[in-house]
């Protein structure tokens, strides 16, 4: 196909494009806004820029109406997200994050579905101190949000530790090498002096340019048989290919993404498609050139159609592949065979190479805090004080106390026991396979509860599960407070998307290994109807399933929902 069809959609640039253009490479008036003493918030333009620095301005929506009555501004606060490729933290970094959450945040840490930390409830006056403390722990928040490449994920379960280590190094290299080059972050938060003069755009941002990307860009690397990072949900996914215990390269998959807009069929979740294979040393080149295609041809006019998945679907998979190979100057090899078995975590102790041990722990909703009857945050703090390995955050909002020496295993096991930290074995497998986004009260986009509500809903679903002998049956269940899809709802065998307070669209039929999207089953229903539907479907699954048949496969075979064969027919 000729180059004549390679163009971005026409239309005036969105307001965010104007903000980026006028921002002097993400500086804007952020420095001044953060010093403004009369408001705990910042201007809308600066908030759009703030994302690229790893933060969103939010307010406590539980307090919104009361504050309006009192004629007060909203209870503004900031969410801060750390850039932590592959979800790997040292015990020392864990202790710093723990302390900052208690000192400046709301006393909790959120483990995200992209393997990093979020802190909520930080006041404007404490932001700079918090970011500087994170920096002193050899971490940062650069590009954790915004129209750039986000936190690079990789499979965290350390069964193949040597392979995992290599894959982690590649994810770290990608994350570091694809960072924006502007010094705005260092000047605003770390008091670096601005260099005088006006350098050329290609000096400041050789890859991104002055407008950065049309929308966020997500990369993840999976190591089969685990698809815990949901590689097909990424804008750019890499699937590690291992032969004779050696990493020989990666299959390349492009064009995934979960977000959509209620009522707009031109928006939809989509799965990345495998287009070929590259060697490890070609990985960065493939990533960089793919990003530049999105930079040049993505939609800068309509933000809800600006993700790379829409660029791929609009131009055509083959066209994008050809353009990628054009820019690379070489062709991708043919994709290699691979096999995924699941996209969940494997819990409990497992022994890796070199006599090291790893404990995968269930953290419901990814929320690390101290409850009245469960001192989770304190327990993890005490473990971090004695642990000499690392701590890995998983894409399912759990964590792994990893690389534990045989000498330390006894002490760490005692602390796990003392604080009741759990591998989730006494819960149903469905609860262990659940994830939820933050939603209310802090997320400004949420239309309904998610993290605060899903555990209570599962309490009731568990009764149906246990009555039907399904306690040990892994069924992935995911809930998001809005259609943006942070908890990857469209890849849950049972998925819920918030529509209004207490109301959800219910989806069924995603694949257990993350290779098929779900289909809407019921629209705008509340708890009573959700439970009524599951009281009908789960007993049927228990009685009628074939041996080894997964719930997501069963509901399609039984005709309960149609199969979604591609994101473009998600709404059919």
UniProtKB/Swiss-Prot annotation:
A single cellular component GO annotation: sulfite reductase complex (NADPH)
Record's cofactor remark: Binds 1 siroheme per subunit.
Quaternary context: Alpha(8)-beta(8). The alpha component is a flavoprotein, the beta component is a hemoprotein.
InterPro entries: CysI, NiRdtase/SiRdtase_haem-b_fer, Nit/Sulf_reduc_fer-like_dom_sf, NO2/SO3_Rdtase_4Fe4S_dom, NO2/SO3_Rdtase_4Fe4S_prot, NO2/SO3_Rdtase_4Fe4S_sf, NO2/SO3_Rdtase_FeS/sirohaem_BS
Binding site for siroheme: 486
Family as reported in the entry's similarity comment: Belongs to the nitrite and sulfite reductase 4Fe-4S domain family.
UniProtKB keywords: 4Fe-4S, Amino-acid biosynthesis, Cysteine biosynthesis, Heme, Iron, Iron-sulfur, Metal-binding, NADP, Oxidoreductase
Reported cofactor(s): siroheme; [4Fe-4S] cluster
UniProt-listed HAMAP family: CysI
Entry function: Component of the sulfite reductase complex that catalyzes the 6-electron reduction of sulfite to sulfide. This is one of several activities required for the biosynthesis of L-cysteine from sulfate.
PANTHER family, per database record: SULFITE REDUCTASE [NADPH] SUBUNIT BETA, SULFITE REDUCTASE [NADPH] SUBUNIT BETA-RELATED
Organism annotation: Bacillus licheniformis (strain ATCC 14580 / DSM 13 / JCM 2505 / CCUG 7422 / NBRC 12200 / NCIMB 9375 / NCTC 10341 / NRRL NRS-1264 / Gibson 46)
Reactions this protein catalyses: hydrogen sulfide + 3 NADP(+) + 3 H2O = sulfite + 3 NADPH + 4 H(+)
Pathway involvement of the protein, from the record: Sulfur metabolism; hydrogen sulfide biosynthesis; hydrogen sulfide from sulfite (NADPH route): step 1/1
Protein's UniProt name: Sulfite reductase [NADPH] hemoprotein beta-component
Alphabetical GO biological process terms: cysteine biosynthetic process; hydrogen sulfide biosynthetic process; sulfate assimilation
Binding site for [4Fe-4S] cluster: 437, 443, 482, 486
Annotated GO MF terms: 4 iron, 4 sulfur cluster binding; heme binding; metal ion binding; NADP binding; sulfite reductase (ferredoxin) activity; sulfite reductase (NADPH) activity
EC number: 1.8.1.2
Phylogenetic lineage: Bacteria, Bacillati, Bacillota, Bacilli, Bacillales
